[in-house]
From Swiss-Prot:
One of its GO terms (biological process) is alpha-linolenic acid metabolic process. Belongs to the fatty acid desaturase type 1 family. The chain crosses the membrane at residues 44-64, 74-94, 166-186, 217-237, 240-260. Expressed exclusively in the developing seeds. Not detected in leaves. One of its GO terms (cellular component) is membrane. A motif (Histidine box-1) lies at residues 95-99. This is Fatty acid conjugase FAC2 B. Pfam families: FA_desaturase (PF00487). Pathway: Lipid metabolism; polyunsaturated fatty acid biosynthesis. The keyword Acyltransferase does not apply. Its EC number is 1.14.19.14. It is a multi-pass membrane protein.
Amino acid sequence: MGKAASAKKVLERVPISKPPFEYNDLKKAVPPHCFSRPLSRSLYFLFHDIIVTCILFYVASNYIHMLPRFLSCIVWPVYWISQGVFLGRLWMIGHECGHHSFSNYRWVDDTVGFLIHTATLTPYFSFKYSHRNHHAHTNSMEYDEVHIPKRKSEALYFEFLGNNPIGLMITMLCKLTFGYAAYIMFNYTGKKHKSGGLASHFYPQSPLFNDSERNHVLFSDIGICIVLYACYRIVTVTGAMPAFYVYGIPWVIMSAILFAATYLQHTHPSIPHYDTTEWNWLRGALSTIDRDLGFFNMNKTHYHVIHHLFPVIPEYHAQEATEAIKPILGQYYKYDGTPFLKALWREMKECIYVESDEGQKKQGIYWFKNKT
């Protein structure tokens, strides 16, 4: 198959008819050992990433500034990207903990997840609770939690104004730099809550949470405050610029990776969104897409369909589990191997809003479009 034909096939829409299989059919196809999550194996991956992260921090803190200026201008960006990737890998382990896919012990998962996410300035329990709602309502126009597309009827002046090479570049840079932080702080790309109030992951009274979760949200905030205070103390000793170089920029890289990965997993011309007249859980879970984000080297970013179907499966079993269900999924499974930056550019250009097709009998099914 030629490149043009292959690119066209990637953009073919997934079926919207009722799947010829049930959820239990998929579960039976997954090898039972894929659901096992031995603590020893999970700890191996955790300590591996912690050790690499600490080595990178140590080298950056003690040696890069000693290099000649022309050489440090090369080494610093290499460090920023490498450390950003490994911070992202650690963040993903914390995300695994929130799904109880790190070990068989929930208290272990919550302890590890809290420590990791707090170190990466993510309120663990707050994100765990909102992310649970995302998995419960994936690709629902009304109830999903993140990356909810705009309808054509909504204000789109800014989106259309920026749909040109310069505008797209500015939009991409802004979203990659600030998108993740804006989501955590202000629920950017999240759903609109009818009850009002500040929809922030840092606000215990936020409509994102119910009453039984608010104390855990406060506990997460305390953890973040401790880390921020530690950062402040480090800055008073080392100065702002060294701290920004060693931790700040890698954190921005991590944030960009997380925003881009989740955006690409839920944004594609071939993937539909549904309103309440058409949505059901299986439809939503199947409306995700597997991508090859090789630079991240984390299976949860590659195999996202299986993650939404069975979030308890640990990332090191995700590939095997995916291969087991692909024959059953058939055309309902979507994979796009388009290179990362090319895919990000295409999706930001082509996926501006969603609307139902003209003449479509079922008006509750929405597809990405970009026509004015």
